[in-house]
């Protein structure tokens, strides 16, 4: 929905995190192959990027969709650059006694199961023309888990961003899995537009001049959730306060 700048009297941006392990988010993990390929959401994104139907943007630059990425750059962001190792050359030195070595390139394969979360960037706008609050998704980013040297979880970081408005026509062609009724499936566009996903708020523009994520100033996970809920409540209260006058 297009809202003119003059009619947009209130505007906030919100960043959310989707955990694919939550029951409501099971469609994101659906692995079946159908006529148009693998139906897992990360596979759909990668196939659309590889075919040139949508553009991926560098998540290390910003989240404003300014710096396009090549598919090679995406692959390196997901699994790292190939490593060149020096190993014994048993073809020329069968028993290894001569110490003849040769270089070999080791590449890691990308495992779609490693993408366990997604980040959503959205905008909440109050339209004075319709007297309604509207939400529109601006971007989606798959997140990669980062681990410490001892194997413990440290953080997540976006692999790349895709601009959602450009992607909507393509997502309308892919069906999202419905575990409750396989015959009543919806498209991925319908899933996002009807907000059929569970998420938590991880950042907003509300009272945030330093542009910090919640975990940047609140360390306790429970308090982070409460802070995110408070941000949502402030947005909803803006609309309710207008109706109370």
Give the role of each language-model region:
Residues 132, 137-150, 154:
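Extended serine/threonine-enriched, polar tracts that run as long, contiguous segments within proteins
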Residues 138, 158, 178-182:
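Generic alpha-helical propensity signal that fires on short helical segments
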Residues 113-115, 135-137, 157-159:
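Extracytoplasmic
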Residues 150-166:
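Short linear, low-complexity motifs centered on an aromatic residue
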Residues 1-129, 147, 165-245:
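A domain-level signal for the mature, folded cores of soluble proteins
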């Amino acid at each position: 929905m297009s809202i003119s700048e003059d009619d947009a009297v209130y505007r906030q941006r919100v960043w959310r995190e989707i955990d694919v392990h939550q029951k409501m988010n099971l469609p994101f993990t659906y692995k079946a192959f159908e006529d148009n390929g693998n139906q897992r959401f990360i596979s759909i994104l990668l196939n659309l990027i590889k075919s040139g139907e949508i553009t991926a943007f560098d998540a290390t630059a910003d989240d404003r969709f300014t710096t396009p990425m090549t598919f090679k750059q995406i692959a390196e962001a997901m699994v790292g650059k190939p490593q060149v190792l020096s190993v014994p050359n048993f073809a020329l030195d069968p028993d290894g006694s001569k110490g003849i070595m040769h270089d070999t390139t080791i590449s890691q394969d990308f495992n779609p199961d490693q993408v366990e979360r997604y980040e959503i960037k959205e905008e909440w706008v109050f339209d004075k023309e319709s007297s309604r609050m509207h939400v529109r998704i601006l971007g989606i980013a798959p997140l990669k888990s980062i681990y410490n040297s001892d194997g413990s979880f440290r953080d997540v970081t976006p692999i790349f961003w895709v601009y959602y408005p450009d992607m909507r026509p393509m997502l309308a062609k892919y069906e999202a899995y419905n575990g409750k009724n396989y015959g009543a499936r919806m498209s991925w566009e319908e899933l996002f537009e009807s907000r059929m996903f569970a998420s938590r708020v991880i950042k907003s523009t509300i009272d945030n001049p330093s542009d910090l994520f919640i975990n940047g100033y609140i360390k306790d996970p429970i308090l982070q959730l409460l802070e995110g809920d408070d941000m949502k409540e402030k947005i909803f209260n803006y609309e309710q306060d207008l109706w109370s006058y």
